[in-house]
Amino acid sequence: VLPGLTLLDLLLRHHPLAAVMTSPSNHTLLSQALAGKATCFMQSELPFLDAAKNPLPFSAPAGNGCALKHLVEKGIWDTWKQAGIEYVNVLNVDNILADPTDTSLAALAQAEGNEAVMRVIPRQNPQENVGVIVGEEGHWHIKEYTELTAQEKDLTQYLYASISFFCFSMSFIQKAAALSLPLHYVWKKIPGTSLSGWKCEYYIFDLLP
């Protein structure tokens, strides 16, 4: 990355069709800052739940599992399709070392005839807050770190970690938009309050075929 340039700056230099998923708390700010540079689309929210999983009067973003659905519903997929886009890199904003302009995953997907590929790295220690790569019955999927048992966190159990960097074909995105995903529950502090509750989220890795 060039000095003074963020990864988003780098992305927008090379891919003017970039899209950024926002939340209600930052949508206006990001939309104004990126006007004419990227398409901003806002994710939906879900309520926090109490210990008995009853809704509380507080909400939070529904998670990155909604991203592909929003791309289709908000017309962004149509725009990209008309522009001749075939593959889309999808990565989380907290992955600050990822290069959104990396075309190697798309090249791999095209060469191998795959509609969804992901980048993984070797795990470093059992306490890392990263999802782990699990192979079962010929399929690969990701298990979130908050849902791992002590045994599953052992480095000898699962060797590789997800860095939330995916590449999807446009046809896969269109199909994924119609899928129903399971909810994941994480006990968290509710921002702006002294309370804690179950935060409900959809995870994008549940879309993996």
Placement of each model-derived feature along the sequence:
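Catalytic core of tubulin tyrosine ligase-like
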Residues: 77-92, 97-209
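A structural signal for isolated positions on well-ordered beta-strands in alpha/beta enzyme cores
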Residues: 17-19, 39, 89, 117
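Soluble or luminal CAZymes and related metallo-dependent hydrolases
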Residues: 3, 63, 196-199
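Structural alpha-beta junctions
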Residues: 35-40, 111-115
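Short catalytic/ligand-binding loop motif for oxyanion handling, primarily in non-cytosolic enzymes
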Residues: 28-29, 48-49, 98
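Short, conserved secondary-structure transition motifs
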Residues: 22-25, 44-52, 123-129
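N-terminal glycine-rich phosphate-binding loop and ensuing alpha1 helix
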Residues: 1-32, 36, 55-56, 60, ...
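Divalent-metal (Mg2+/Mn2+/Ca2+)-assisted nucleotide/phosphate chemistry catalytic cores
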Residues: 41-93
